[in-house]
Amino acid sequence: MLFRSRNYADFQKYLGDHPETTIVQMDSVIGRVGGKCLLTIHFVETSLMLAFLRDANTSASVIRIINLLDKVLGPKMFSRLFPVILTDNGSEFSNPKEIERRDIVPCKRTNIFYCDPSAPYQKGACEVNHELIRRILPKGSSFDDLTQEDIFLMMDHINSYKRKKLNDRSPYEAFSFYYGEDVLKKLGCSPVAAENIILKPKLLKK
């Protein structure tokens, strides 16, 4: 098959053909226009979200992070965690083949699909989790003075925040149950005790 369509209808068909598939949603969170931004990766089943600081909102920066995750996790675990990725039609996600494939065997590492235009609700789980990021980094905030260590800290607090949909477990706990703490460590995640969680801008005040 020389060409595979990647629209939302194709995504739904893929899920129908692979009902046990775990879904990953991918998006960007923008700081000030023209400045640093985030790539967010949301594991829908466990509500765990990863976030990576990028100097610019480019396709190359997204591919670089996907390649890094592939290297850190190894091909087998990467493909287990990322069987299918749903994202939007932003220009930063405009090179699906580079996201889907690696240079070594097995070359195919994931399947990427796109939401319909102007339909962010189709990846609503990711959008809802962004609201927690915006509690710490309000809209209009500059990300230019932040480091990746700051972003890891922010996501540790968000991923340790217990959710009703997870039966009052945190995303960290839910993800650990399915995949183990070793994988979380490889992803740069650490737990935060409930009484120490801060979901306010002061968390990242220098």
Where are these regions (language model features)?
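Structured nucleic-acid-interacting core domains from mobile-element enzymes and related host factors
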Residues: 14-23
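RNase H-like two-metal-ion nuclease catalytic core shared by retroviral integrases
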Residues: 87-89, 100-103, 112-137, 144-156
